[in-house]
């Protein structure tokens, strides 16, 4: 099935990609970034620090990315120093979730809307949803209605809607556990089927790889839960789960593991359309910025950061498929 885009959405999608491949830099982290910064200093990270680091990353690395994902809370200064060639996605969700309940309900930023995100110069709206396909069905209905609203907003504003799905299990506390690894492919691929339906108005899915590669033979350091063929099947099932373009998030894994995973995904038959890669590219700059200052962080970004993004781009050239084949 080929999906039809409006002229405006197509122009926006072209601005966010290079030759149909989305090689985007993700730096919409807020809570996670504060926790990373707090590991290297005793005082609470300041707004100025967060804005400055985001701006440094944007300025130094967007010349090598097709686009950058930022948040409107701390990322607007960074959006203004990005490369002229790079597109902009803005996150619409509040950071984090209520840890006292298993429902992880979505919530939009209070003073933002799809209209305001478009007015801020973004080519797309990105929204993060936590979803457990096997979870409380009343909660899931609430989540579906919420995504329908955002889809309708984005249709009205004629702006692409990137939906990021992070899966979880209401009964498993640790997503890195072997227990969750055993159900991850089911969680990821079934959630993709749900939100690929036209009623949600999603243009691009930003998703996890369907396997925790740390438990796959040839990738695992310790316990092996999956053969390479079982892992490959999970990627094939993912490809079959949607007609929409989909891109991978790096989920905080190392640059090397993420790149190796993309090669494995492509060899398995996944026709993914790019990445929104965050920490795997810039994580090392946080410690340098806090301990040695902005100039040292800039130097790190020009060397290590560039190396990470350049290597990733080379892998994408070999592995990613253009979204234009689907739309």
Swiss-Prot record:
Keywords linked to the UniProt accession: Lactose metabolism, Lyase
Protein name (Swiss-Prot/TrEMBL): Tagatose 1,6-diphosphate aldolase 2
EC number: 4.1.2.40
Gene name, Swiss-Prot/TrEMBL: lacD2
Signal peptide limits: none
Family, per entry: Belongs to the aldolase LacD family.
GO BP, sorted A to Z: 6-sulfoquinovose(1-) catabolic process; D-tagatose 6-phosphate catabolic process; lactose catabolic process via tagatose-6-phosphate
UniProt key word Isomerase: no
Domain of life: Bacteria
Pathway(s) where this gene product acts: Carbohydrate metabolism; D-tagatose 6-phosphate degradation; D-glyceraldehyde 3-phosphate and glycerone phosphate from D-tagatose 6-phosphate: step 2/2
Top EC class, one word: lyase
SMART domains: DeoC
Entry annotated with the keyword Metal-binding: no
An annotated Gene Ontology molecular function: tagatose-6-phosphate kinase activity
Reaction equation(s) it catalyzes: D-tagatofuranose 1,6-bisphosphate = D-glyceraldehyde 3-phosphate + dihydroxyacetone phosphate
Species name: Streptococcus pyogenes serotype M1
